[in-house]
């Protein structure tokens, strides 16, 4: 079959980028590393200045945030991963606070312009369609608004469906590469996380639809669901943890109202095993983040369960999930998209689950959030709160009532301190309340 495109080198491709341009880089494990390297080489050679780099969470190297590129690249992430965290905290890079579900809107409505979108796709089929692979998120919107789209054709990119399929006519410049997708190892849950997983699993009914992020706690929850039935998935991301449940027939999606029988997400992150699973799999739909994270779409799924975590929670129920005090650690992400959506679902539950302390024994349940902390989930939004000491429902509870409930699932070492802080805030009635709650 005649080749459907003419490829150039990465070095040739990035020559379309000019000083002052805004460049979007595709996300997570689907970063076009050869284009990133070629762009940085141009910057290092003194050919560019004030080029704006935008992306969501990315894996792998992010050299454009290094001190040598100050004045050359202006970095603005919608979510801060480990590869750019230190630079953001030092002021060498920057962060745009935004709900994950609204990142596409930033491009489509031109709040942020996109001169060039650098993406990675699978080889075209006989009809000329490529796939965005493991991450659609805001990349599709960036493509639609970009003046130029540079695509790396890579045989390791899985062919996924839903909004992931795009025609090669929408791509301006092609580059070929065969670098494997960046795999992400999932840590094994410790005993504390396993206990949290068990408490959360008790809140999940047969026929529920799940959203949960990446990490030890989501994996711990999934490992407790082997006896559940007809679980559905509508989420912003999923990883290897769902594979045993699919194999066992626990995940069917038969109770979903929208996309019945389908696993719906906007990106996938994990090992080669999960990328192989989604490759050519019509049961998986990767959709624009504007769809997956729309609270009013989420709310239509019956028994919608969202499970998210936090860095700190205070006694009023405010959850910080994006910063360590004033230092940005990650980002808003899709937490509030799903907290709001799940709480409006018929039979749904919005869960914030986290250990009561850090691995170093630092208390995560505090009288008030640290100075500069972002209240990602507000005291008005929180419903269920789970630690290794239990699960409490804060919805409809007064400030004093919820303080007592939160203290009840705090680490015993810190309960007296928290009780004293609440007494100081609320007065003698607080202790009366404790005996009558």
Where are these predicted regions, by residue range?
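Conserved alpha/beta enzyme-core scaffold
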Residues: 1-437
């Amino acid at each position: 079959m005649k080749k459907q495109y003419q490829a150039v080198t990465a070095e040739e491709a990035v020559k379309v980028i000019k000083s002052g341009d805004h460049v979007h880089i595709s996300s997570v494990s689907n970063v076009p590393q050869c284009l990133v390297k070629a762009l940085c080489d141009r910057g290092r050679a003194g050919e560019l200045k004030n080029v704006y780099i935008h992306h969501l969470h990315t894996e792998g190297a992010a050299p454009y945030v290094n001190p040598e590129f100050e004045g050359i690249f202006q970095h603005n992430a919608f979510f801060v991963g480990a590869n750019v965290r230190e630079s953001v905290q030092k002021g060498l890079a920057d962060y745009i606070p935004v709900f994950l579900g609204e990142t596409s809107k930033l491009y489509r409505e031109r709040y942020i312009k996109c001169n060039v979108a650098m993406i990675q796709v699978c080889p075209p089929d006989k009809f000329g369609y490529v796939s965005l692979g493991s991450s659609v998120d805001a990349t599709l919107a960036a493509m639609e608004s970009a003046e130029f789209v540079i695509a790396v054709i890579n045989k390791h990119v899985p062919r996924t469906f839903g909004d992931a399929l795009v025609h090669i006519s929408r791509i301006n410049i092609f580059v070929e590469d065969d670098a494997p997708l960046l795999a992400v190892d999932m840590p094994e849950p410790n005993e504390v996380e396993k206990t949290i997983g068990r408490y959360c699993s008790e809140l999940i009914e047969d026929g529920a639809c799940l959203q949960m992020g990446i990490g030890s706690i989501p994996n711990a929850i999934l490992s407790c669901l082997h006896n559940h039935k007809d679980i559905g998935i509508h989420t912003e991301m999923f990883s290897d943890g769902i594979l045993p449940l699919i194999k066992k027939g626990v995940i069917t999606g038969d109770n979903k109202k929208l996309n019945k029988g389908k696993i719906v997400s906007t990106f996938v992150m994990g090992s080669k095993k999960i990328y192989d699973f989604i490759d050519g799999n019509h049961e998986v739909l990767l959709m624009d983040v504007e769809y997956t994270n729309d609270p009013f779409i989420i709310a239509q799924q019956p028994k919608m369960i969202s499970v998210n975590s936090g860095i700190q929670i205070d006694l009023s129920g405010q959850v910080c999930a994006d910063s360590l005090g004033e230092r940005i650690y990650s980002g808003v992400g899709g937490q509030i998209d799903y907290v709001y959506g799940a709480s409006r679902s018929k039979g749904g539950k919005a869960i914030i689950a986290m250990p009561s302390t850090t691995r170093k024994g630092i208390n995560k349940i505090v009288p008030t959030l640290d100075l500069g902390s972002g209240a990602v989930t507000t005291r008005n939004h929180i419903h269920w709160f789970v630690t290794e000491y239990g699960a409490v429902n804060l919805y409809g509870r007064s400030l004093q009532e919820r303080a007592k409930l939160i203290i009840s699932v705090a680490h015993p070492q810190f309960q007296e301190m928290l009780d004293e802080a609440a007494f100081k805030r609320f007065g003698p009635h607080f202790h009366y309340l404790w005996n009558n709650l």
